[in-house]
């Protein structure tokens, strides 16, 4: 059986990266929430 997680740096950045987050209203909300919480890493 093939495993579900097949790591790819490119896909990770495109789907969960900072620019991907900033491109939608909901994504900006995620970044704002993580900033408010004081996260060291805001996105992938």
From Swiss-Prot:
GO annotation, cellular component aspect: ribonucleoprotein complex; ribosome
TM ranges: none
One annotated GO molecular function: structural constituent of ribosome
Chain positions covered by the region annotation Disordered: 1-44
Gene Ontology terms describing biological process: translation
Signal peptide: none
Composition-biased stretches (Basic residues): 10-19, 26-44
InterPro entries registered for this protein in UniProt: Ribosomal_bL34 (IPR000271), Ribosomal_bL34_CS (IPR020939)
UniProt keyword annotations, A-Z: Ribonucleoprotein, Ribosomal protein
A UniProt-annotated Pfam family: Ribosomal_L34
Similarity comment: Belongs to the bacterial ribosomal protein bL34 family.
Name of the featured protein: Large ribosomal subunit protein bL34
Gene this chain is encoded by: rpmH
């Amino acid at each position: 059986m093939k495993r579900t997680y097949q790591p790819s740096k490119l896909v990770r950045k495109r789907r969960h990266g900072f620019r991907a987050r900033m491109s939608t209203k909901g994504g900006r909300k995620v970044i704002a929430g993580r900033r408010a919480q004081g996260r060291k890493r805001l996105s992938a």
